From Swiss-Prot:
Protein name according to UniProt: Beta sliding clamp
Regulation: induction: Part of the dnaA-dnaN-recF-gyrB operon, but also transcribed from at least 3 promoters within the upstream dnaA gene, induced at 42 degrees Celsius. Induced 1.5-fold by hydroxyurea. A shorter isoform, beta* is induced by UV treatment and also at low levels in late logarithmic/early stationary phase growth (at protein level). Beta* transcription induced by naldixic acid.
Location of the region described as 1 in the Swiss-Prot/TrEMBL record: 1-120
Pfam family, one: DNA_pol3_beta_3
Purpose: Confers DNA tethering and processivity to DNA polymerases and other proteins. Acts as a clamp, forming a ring around DNA (a reaction catalyzed by the clamp-loading complex) which diffuses in an ATP-independent manner freely and bidirectionally along dsDNA. DNA bound in the ring is bent 22 degrees, in solution primed DNA is bound more tightly than dsDNA, suggesting the clamp binds both ss- and dsDNA. In a complex of DNA with this protein, alpha, epsilon and tau subunits however the DNA is only slightly bent. Required for DnaA inactivation. The RIDA complex (regulatory inactivation of DnaA), composed of ATP-DnaA, Hda and the DNA-loaded beta sliding clamp (this protein) rapidly hydrolyzes ATP-DnaA to ADP-DnaA in a DNA-dependent fashion, preventing reinitiation of DNA replication. DnaA inactivation is stimulated by DNA synthesis.
Gene name of the encoded protein: dnaN
Spans annotated as 3: 245-365
Assembly behavior: Forms a ring-shaped head-to-tail homodimer around DNA, which can be opened by the delta subunit. Binds interacting factors in a hydrophobic surface cleft between domains 2 and 3, each monomer is able to bind different proteins simultaneously. The beta* isoform probably forms homotrimers which probably load onto DNA. The DNA polymerase III holoenzyme complex contains at least 10 different subunits organized into 3 functionally essential subassemblies: the Pol III core, the beta sliding clamp processivity factor and the clamp-loading complex.
Main subcellular location of this protein, as a coarse class: cytoplasm
Segments for region (2): 129-243
BP GO annotations: bacterial-type DNA replication; DNA damage response; DNA strand elongation involved in DNA replication; DNA-templated DNA replication; error-prone translesion synthesis; negative regulation of DNA-templated DNA replication initiation; regulation of DNA-templated DNA replication initiation
Effect upon mutating R24A: Mild defect in DNA replication, impaired loading of clamp on DNA, polymerase speed is wild-type. More severe replication defect and very poor clamp loading
The species this protein was found in: Escherichia coli (strain K12)
Membrane-crossing segments per the record: none
Length: 366
């Protein structure tokens, strides 16, 4: 195996394929990258057995086919440490891989390519293409609601659901729920899968904001995304995701509208004097007015009064202020609508001008 490539052509692919690798691999070979040269292309693969990332780099200079695996971190650090515009010549000699550039020379240990674990072959059941920006929006709108190391393992991820011409993402940790739907202009079978938290983060990392469309394939146990020269595959979480439709408030009759930034700033200020552990704030809603109060064990108090659009019965309700702020930060809109029922029912929050995303936050007893 032998190839020569410019440093700039190798850095981004190396960075992307090193993404899935954990800090301390369970098997030594999982800390390595698989390098394969064939048909004028260098393929780089990194895996942690749950997901894999493959990058392809076109080789324009003379090369010889072959394959090996090398320590990912060291190879990346060497390439990154070389000067801009450097040419990197790589050659396999016995059990060592030689890396040369200018007057620098490195000899890396290798492990046989045949020992590198590949994800099993699988058949895709649903396939579609969408703009990167659409996928980015779907993930950004909901990922903050994913659970983190919950014993209900199926909550440590994101539900991807196809229905009609829409792709939907849903995330919940049992206290709050986020759902976002976007039309993708293709008629799709009804199908839903749970992508693990780490897979969602890697999928987000591979979106570079370019014009290259994203091609998605979903199988019974795997999801794969292709964009440009990168292919990302992740195993799915096996479990039943809660039905988000049953979580949305049935018929909330009290609607409050207010400026998103105004609300965000008021909640952020009130949060300063909320209980550090429970983060509770109390909302008092009356005719065109919202009062937010918070206090803590030191008996310090915060009060914010805002002009809002509201006509309905007066009520009070408590929330974890962190959950409300997460929603307001994700909304990025001008005005928000809060749909309330009573003091013991969840609130639904959405962009007043769009219904593509909805957020549900459970109340707190204060």
């Amino acid at each position: 195996m032998k190839f020569t490539v410019e440093r700039e052509h190798l850095l981004k692919p190396l960075q992307q394929v090193s993404g899935p690798l954990g800090g301390r691999p369970t098997l030594p070979i999982l800390g390595n990258l698989l390098l394969q040269v064939a048909d004028g292309t260098l393929s780089l693969t990194g895996t942690d057995l749950e997901m894999e990332m493959v990058a392809r780099v076109a080789l324009v200079q003379p090369h010889e086919p072959g394959a090996t695996t090398v320590p990912a971190r060291k190879f990346f650090d060497i390439c990154r440490g070389l000067p801009e515009g450097a040419e990197i010549a790589v050659q396999l000699e016995g059990e060592r891989m030689l890396v040369r550039s200018g007057r620098s020379r490195f000899s890396l240990s290798t492990l046989p390519a045949a020992d590198f674990p590949n994800l099993d072959d699988w058949q895709s059941e649903v396939e579609f293409t969408l703009p990167q920006a659409t996928m980015k929006r779907l993930i950004e709108a909901t990922q903050f609601s994913m659970a983190h190391q919950d014993v209900r393992y199926y909550l440590n991820g994101m539900l991807f659901e196809t229905e009609g011409e829409e792709l939907r993402t849903v995330a919940t940790d049992g206290h709050r729920l986020a759902v976002c739907s976007m039309p993708i202009g293709q008629s799709l079978p009804s199908h839903s899968v749970i992508v693990p938290r780490k897979g969602v983060i890697e999928l987000m990392r591979m979106l570079d904001g370019g014009d290259n469309p994203l091609r998605v394939q979903i199988g019974s146990n795997n999801i794969r995304a292709h964009v440009g020269d990168f292919i990302f595959t992740s195993k799915l979480v096996d479990g039943r995701f809660p039905d988000y439709r049953r979580v949305l408030p049935k018929n909330p009759d009290k609607h409050l509208e207010a400026g998103c930034d105004l609300l965000k700033q008021a909640f952020a200020r009130a949060a300063i004097l909320s209980n550090e552990k429970f983060r509770g704030v109390r909302l008092y809603v009356s005719e065109n007015q919202l009062k937010i109060t918070a206090n803590n064990p030191e008996q310090e108090e915060a009060e914010e009064i805002l002009d809002v659009t509201y006509s309905g019965a007066e009520m009070e309700i408590g929330f974890n202020v962190s959950y409300v702020l997460d929603v307001l930060n994700a909304l990025k809109c001008e005005n928000v609508r809060m749909m309330l029922t009573d003091s013991v029912s969840s609130v639904q929050i959405e962009d007043a001008a769009s219904q593509s995303a909805a957020y549900v936050v459970m109340p707190m007893r204060l």
